[in-house]
Amino acid sequence: MAMNLPPLAGSGGAHTQPSLPALPAHLQSDTHLTAHLASRFHLSLPTAQLSSHALISLNTYTSSSKGPDGGKEGSAMAGAEEMAERAWLRLGHRSENQAVVFLGESGSGKSTLRSHLLASLLNKSSTPLSTKVSLAAYVFDTLTTTKTATTPTASKAGLFYELQYDTASTTNPVLIGGKLLDHRLERSRIADVPTGERNFHVLYYLLAGTSPAEKAHLGLEDSAVQQRRWKYLGHPTQLKVGINDAEGFQVFKNALKKLEFPRSEIAEICQILASVLHIGQLEFESSANTQVTGDDSGGFSHEGATVVTAAKNKDVLAIIAAFLGVNAQDLQNTLSYKTKMIHKERVTVMLDPNGARSHANELARTIYSLLVTYIIESINQRLCAADDAVANTISIIDFPGFEQQASTKSALDQLLNNSATEALYNLTLQNFFDRKADMLENEEVSVAATSYFDNSDAVRGLLKPGNGLLSILDDQSRRHRTDIQFLESMRKRFEGKNPAITAGSSTAKLPGSNFLTENSAPIFTVKHFAGEVDYQVKGLTEENGEVISGDLLNMINSTKSEFVARLFGQDALQTVTHPKERSTVMQATISSKPMRTPSVMSRKTARTARNQRVLQQKAAEEELEKLSENNSQAGGAAKAAASEQGASGQFLAALDNVTKAVADPSTNSYFVFCLKPNDRRIASQFDSKCVRTQVQTFGIAEISQRLRSADFSLFLPFGEFLGLADAETILMGSERERVEMVVEDKRWPSNEVRIGSTGVFVSERCWMEIAHLSEASLAHGRFGLPSDGGDGLTPHGASPADPFAASKERLLSTGNTPLMYGEKGKNGYFGANDGSDSRSEAGVSAFGGGDMFKNFDTREQMAERGNEKSLVEVEEYRDSASRKRWLFMVYLLTWFIPDFLIRFIGRMPRKDVRMAWREKLAINLIIWLSCLLAAFFIVVFPMLICPRQHVYSAAELSAYDGSSGSPGAYVSIRGYVFDLEKFAPRHYPPNLVSTEDILEYAGKDATSLFPVQVSALCQGRAGSIDPAVLIDYRSTNVTGSPTLISQQDINANFHDFRYFTNDTRKDWYFQQMAMLRANYLKGRIGYSPKYMKTLARNSRTIVSMNGRVFDLTEYVVGGRRTVGEDGKDISGVAEDSYDFMEPDVVTLFRQLSGADATRHWASLNLSEQAKTRMLTCLNNLFYVGDVDTRSSVRCKFAEYLVLAISIMLVTIIAFKFFAALQFGTKNMPENLDKFIMCQIPAYTEDEDSLRRAIDSAARMHYDDKRKLLVVICDGMIVGQGNDRSTPRIVLDILGVSETVDPEPLSFESLGEGLKQHNMGKVYSGLYEVQGHIVPFLVVVKVGKPSEVSRPGNRGKRDSQMVIMRFLNRVHYNLAMSPLELEMYHQIRNIIGVNPTFYEFMFQIDADTVVAPDSATRMVSAFLDDTRLIAVCGETALTNAKSSFITMIQVYEYWISHNLTKAFESLFGSVTCLPGCFSMYRIRAAETGKPLFVSREIVEAYATIRVDTLHMKNLLHLGEDRYLTTLLLKFHNKYKTKYIFRAHAWTIAPDSWAVFMSQRRRWINSTVHNLIELIPMAQLCGFCCFSMRFIVFVDLLSTVLQPVTMAYIVYLIVMVIRSPDVVPVTAFILIAAVFGLQAIIFILRRKWEMIGWMVLYILAIPVFSFGLPLYSFWYMDDFNWGNTRVVAGEKGKKIIVTDEGKFDPASIPRKKWEEYQGEIWEAQTVRDDARSEVSGFSYATKGHPGVQVGVSEYGGYSRPGSIAGGFSGAHAMPPLPMNTSRMSLAASEMGGNRASQFGGSQYFSPEDMVGLPSDDALLAEIREILRTADLMTVTKKGIKQELERRFGVPLDAKRAYINSATEALLSGQL
């Protein structure tokens, strides 16, 4: 049949033809079609059609609603509406499911056309639900769209939007629901915003649209914003790109309200969005965590602090914690650590700042993704109809456009996005080329083949289930394979098999190298339909896992926010629980597929005419129901499998749902090809090359060619066709013939109709024509139901201007331009239908206006609620009497501080913390008071005894003569000393006497220059004196030094204003003296009592009263005269004026000359008025100075008191010096045969430190067979800078294969609540290093399955307790925990030494290196003195020169050992044995009595309740010192010593923060431990020679260190001020201290110590002043944990904790004999177990043919590390899963062991024939042991010797031989 195409429409030319297939054949090439599109584009006709199947739309970047005439006709909007009309008609008239698939690059306008299509479809519905469905789409776009370089509204999540209809009753479908299915949100964008792009719009909306009050609540204040850049929002310019974010936020909130979200939930959503923004603001830094906890572990380098990552901006952290409802500290800890699964082991990685930043990004991505999922699921719950009510659906499919380059750094997002685009394009090709091929063939209709680009290879390669690329990626990720392994797997799968996928090389040659190395940037290439794309392999498998750390989830489990709990309780969060602890979440992933699947495509109809379609739809329904069940069934195997799927697997499953739903036979699909006219987003510019590339990419020319030959959209059976055609009038012929007549009559083109054998294939146009649904009906919407407001989503009279996708588009505009999915008027999102849906207002009425947080809790209240803990009671106790007394004293000292001030100002809500603060304050007050008393005693007390006198003797005054070298220029006037040097420049008048002349009087008595008017200064006996009376003055200085100035001095006349002169000024002298005393007084002339007596003997009348000295000599000898006004002597002056002094006073002075007359003055028979007058006269006329008491006895006592203190201190130092003088030859000790354990606790040290410590211990010159390395790994932690966990590092060093994986066993630990239950793994074997082969035992604390963060970590003290408790139970024969039984087994049966044989415990830290002879020297000391219980050696620094901080510590370390510890060692009581280098006696040599592991010590050291300040300082600050205290306390008959010849080297803190924290620990620990020691009466010695006295001195010196520094400063000041002999002597004594120290290191030839001593002296202010004050004040700086004490009834105290209550019965315990008995009953002892007497076993070496020893616990023991050895796993059959464990019930202990270890065989009675009897065997065994070397004999060797002697195989007797050997060796037989 000839193809008759319709003529070109109109007469306007080819460009008026909208349908591309209608163009002539010669115009069907890519170039011609592009030209055709260009011609239409330039006429404002941006659309074209591919028949009725597809719409081609070009983005004009201006308006999507403007046609050529300015109206809607011809616009993209009109094209979308026409397609909506077609879908609507097909849905209503044929009850078919409809699907509209959008294809196009980013920026091509897909989102805009989608919104037009959706608006048009919703406009057809009369149901009020349509508004909500529209709003749901807006909410989805707000959450998932962003601005990119190509478009301001780029979709970043795949959308499958399903509109649900009931089509049963009418041809007008009824909208009954909607379903949003989101596919793979681009989560990587949250924390990685590409340059020039934005994050998701909602975050900007929140920032711009909230009110000031809301911003304040959310922490988004403008003032704060101006000072910071929001890291998650990209460059600040992205906040101002023409998008109306504020308006968008209001629309978003209103949309949520209309969708019935409660007001509180909308507010919570905003809080979560704000928390996402704040997470981006978090800044991290590496800091030293100086806050002490019980979990601290490690060596000296860890003692001061643990290097952790902390948040810089705590305020931001607090906001996030408040909104998430968690504790801020917990949040910081969670972000600083990350728990991972590495090789089936759960480890916690200590993150550096970059790692913490990544972890915070993970939290932000998780929160945002869950929020989006929650909102979408909540919308679906409100909109989605029940499946059985849905007849048909219209589905809108819009996935993000193809990406040539990843916009974010996520290769996974790019791969999945492009895979989806590939699948949708393949779906398009199938629809046009292959969909009806089978039906055409069955109907015997032939269609000419059309060539086209088939992307099936790429689709199969990417999406094929099982072995497609995404499936391979998912499989490799699930199996924890590396990226290179994934690349190799992909190569094996696709190389030579699929041309679309090419795997790159995994190796590469570095420049300048000829050797292949691993490729650092491997790629694989996929040939997509849109071009080749290279994908980075690096990090792809890890990213595909999308693992959310269990730390985050466990933190969220404690949230107090119900909303956050709901977010994390969604099914979208797929958790992985521990197989043995289902309540423990190990990790989780967020689903990359929707929570729901497409609805079942069914139609409720009973029309018999459509039975065939009904059957087809039922088949489709069954298929999709199976698909739905497989993806949604809860709790079954399918869900378990899904939970193991990674992102690619989940996305693949979801994409498969989409493609099957669209490709279903009952679904009619439409396609929208969106094209960009140019790449630069320039309006009205058509780039032919750009468009032609897109036309070629989508194969539009091939599709058009196909439609020219076969444009079939429907298949109508003959009967249905004839019914539609009203062909009843044609009565003749068969149905086929009648159909042919109708077709011929219609004259349809051959490409639109074909007649088959049973029906007719027709195009949609033909169907509409025959169904009387004319094309005109599409334009007028005749078959739709118009709303009362027009289209329902467009305002009345709105301008048709509809921005397409430019910066003015919809919500991006600020004026009257339309919003995003509807106009800004009342009929936009909130159109005319709003009022008809009462449900949509349910959430609105409650919302109100203004601040959405108005009735919300404040951030502070949220934070307080987040800090609350759920507590349970764990213990009840009463305070001791001493504790009560102490608390009474505390309150007595701190009563003035009210409790509420500590609570609110100090922010200490917990009572126990407040009490500790009070205790700290009380202790500080006591210390400060002690310091003040010491300072008072040293400084003030001497001054009280001898107050400082400002007096100068005559000789001293003469020294101040102003000459060069003199201290100054002083002059005396009537007993007062003045500063002449200061006065001379101010002499008045200045020109009369020169300054040089004035200074000539320096050092002299200038009294003669100042004549006095007697009557003005003295009232005499009568109350007045005649002014003519004069009195002479003569110096009392009989030696003549200072010289008395003559009265005839040339300058004397200038000061003479007496009565007889022309210029009389009677008060001039008094005034001048007052002025001089006020301004220039330096002191007084001093007369010692001795000098006064000398003067008296020289006929001087000189007396002292009240410390003042008066000289009446001139008065007594008559040195008075009277001079009148004319200057001549006169007579007749009254006697009482001439003899103006009372005779009694004169007599008193004569009689007491040279003595003190104070007491006699009081008894004078004179009136008080007379005494007052006489005293005035004495002070003004006869005063010559003060009594000089500086040489008195009390003043000498005060001076020598300082000297006495110095002598006492130096005496103690001298004793220490003599104690340190230990000389002798350095002899090498002999070889010793004592068994020692060397314990090394490991925490987060690096491999180098651990290797140095382990190797140094292994290489010690001590018999390798008699030392055991015991390494305790404190938790599964990866330290900063490490690539493996610490246990893995240790095991790698020791040579333990990763295949060796013993099962964890329970044991008791030191912790709060349930943390007392811990689990550990035990490894053992031989370690070979530099010729040494040393047995080792490794205990790895792995924690219970419920522990997520830092599993197993309990601290260094707990690590010590693992061994101490084990040995305690061994020696006391107590029941042991499963871990201890395993340790016993490994030591006794694998290593071959009975644990009781070990006599000494050698403890070193993991950062300590010991000298080769250290253990030998220590053991020698123990052997020399059986009363020695513990020793320590000298510890030096390995990092001495790394910083100034370490340099100042070198000398201090050396001197603290060689002076302090050596001195204490004299008394046998070293009070601090450092845990980094000490050895302890485990049991007494003679009696075997436990010492170091005695019951008292173990119980005291294992104290768990550490809730007081004192106990925390003892057990958390200095556990090593406290352990020493316990040894001295409970074993007071034994001694502790310092061995100066044993050496070790450790690492010291090299930063101030860590150094200060370490010293805070040491100082406070010292104080509290010494307080523990002082009450002990057992300390050796007597009186001051006792250690108790030295302990007291040590305590006092520790407390008074600040005063020591102040004392030194005081001495310096004294020397500067008065360099006399006393303070100089004190300095000499102090210098002697360092001199003695210098003698020690000089005698020991430690010359380098000279330099270190200088640095130490410079740092004395730090050591003696700064550190003690800092330490004392921060004595309570602990992490107090969650255990606290509350008041109970009747004075009892109740301990509560949030860690739960520990039940000791949860850890089963058995004695070793019981356990071994059960083992022996079930199996025979293995061949290669050695006698414990031999002390050494080679069973673990794993030589060929030798079975490796295996733990009776079911786990393999560690095979030896000897080269050529083999793993025990290969020597043994695999253990069954039901192997008995000690962690099970006690009744299960020892069960199921008969054949699980390969050790025993079963023999029939026939096997026993001909064998020797047991008695014969016993006799021979006894004979063999009598002559054999017990150090080399083995049980296997005994069996072989017996077989040789008896000549028969003795396998059947193996059990008896082994048990008999054991019994003989142990003495039981």
Swiss-Prot record:
Q: Which reaction does it catalyse?
A: [(1->4)-N-acetyl-beta-D-glucosaminyl](n) + UDP-N-acetyl-alpha-D-glucosamine = [(1->4)-N-acetyl-beta-D-glucosaminyl](n+1) + UDP + H(+)
* GO MF term list: actin binding; ATP binding; chitin synthase activity; cytoskeletal motor activity
Q: Where in the cell is it found?
A: Cell membrane
Q: What is its main location?
A: membrane
What are the start and end residues of every segment in region (Disordered)?
A: 1-23, 593-612, 620-640
**Which stretches make up the Myosin motor domain?**
1-778
Q: What is its EC number?
A: 2.4.1.16
Span of domain DEK-C: 1811-1866
The GO cellular component terms are:
cell septum; myosin complex; plasma membrane
Q: How does the record say this protein sits in the membrane?
A: Multi-pass membrane protein
The record's Gene Ontology biological-process terms are: chitin biosynthetic process; fungal-type cell wall organization
Q: Null phenotype?
A: Leads to a winkled surface morphology. Impairs penetration in host plants and exhibits a significant reduced pathogenicity in Arabidopsis and cotton plants.
Glycosylated residues, chain numbering: N123, N417, N426, N557, N630, N657, N1037, N1062, N1165, N1458, N1564, N1778
Q: Which UniProt keywords apply?
A: Actin-binding, ATP-binding, Cell membrane, Glycoprotein, Glycosyltransferase, Membrane, Motor protein, Myosin, Nucleotide-binding, Transferase, Transmembrane, Transmembrane helix, Virulence
Transmembrane residue ranges: 886-906, 925-945, 1201-1221, 1596-1616, 1622-1642, 1649-1669
**Low complexity: compositionally biased ranges:** 629-640
Q: Which regions form coiled coils? A: none
Residues reported in the UniProt entry to bind ATP: G104, E105, S106, G107, S108, G109, K110, S111
Q: Please list where the region (Actin-binding) is annotated.
A: 655-679
Checking InterPro entries in the record gives: Chitin_synth, Cyt_B5-like_heme/steroid-bd, Cyt_B5-like_heme/steroid_sf, DEK_C, Kinesin_motor_dom_sf, Myosin_head_motor_dom-like, MYSc_Myo17, Nucleotide-diphossugar_trans
**Which stretches make up the Cytochrome b5 heme-binding domain?**
949-1010
Spell out the family assignment given in the record's similarity comment.
In the N-terminal section; belongs to the TRAFAC class myosin-kinesin ATPase superfamily. Myosin family.
State what this protein does. Polymerizes chitin, a structural polymer of the cell wall and septum, by transferring the sugar moiety of UDP-GlcNAc to the non-reducing end of the growing chitin polymer. Plays a role in cell wall integrity and is involved in tolerance to hyperosmotic conditions. Required to successfully penetrate the host plants and thus plays a key role in pathogenicity.
Q: What is this protein called?
A: Chitin synthase 6
User: Could you read off the lineage of the organism from its UniProt record?
Assistant: Eukaryota, Fungi, Dikarya, Ascomycota, Pezizomycotina
